[in-house]
Amino acid sequence: MIVTTTQHIEGKKIIAYKGVIAGEAILGANLFKDLFAGIRDMVGGRSGTYERELERARTIAFQELEQKARELGANAIVGVDIDYEVLGQSNGMLMVSASGTAVVIE
């Protein structure tokens, strides 16, 4: 399946629009992971823990997006947008949402 942020796919003709679709992932952050990530951030390093969790959430959101497109009979997704949000009173949850338009291409 082709997934792109652009509205068109070069060299391909869109023959049917199946609708707007979305995929989301919400992950809770572990207290100890948060503590060590905060310490690393204070000394100027990158937080590998958060980067891995972010990648995992993004993967889940895109898998859900592709699954919904297939259920509609689409073979591509155009106009993909991805958003990140920190949720919860103590910012203990991460939400990644992806949306786009499911289409059929030749």
UniProtKB/Swiss-Prot annotation:
<dbReference type="Pfam" id="PF01906">
    <property type="entry name" value="YbjQ_1"/>
</dbReference>
<dbReference type="InterPro" id="IPR002765">
    <property type="entry name" value="UPF0145_YbjQ-like"/>
</dbReference>
<protein>
    <recommendedName>
        <fullName>UPF0145 protein VVA0283</fullName>
    </recommendedName>
</protein>
<dbReference type="InterPro" id="IPR035439">
    <property type="entry name" value="UPF0145_dom_sf"/>
</dbReference>
<comment type="similarity">
    <text>Belongs to the UPF0145 family.</text>
</comment>
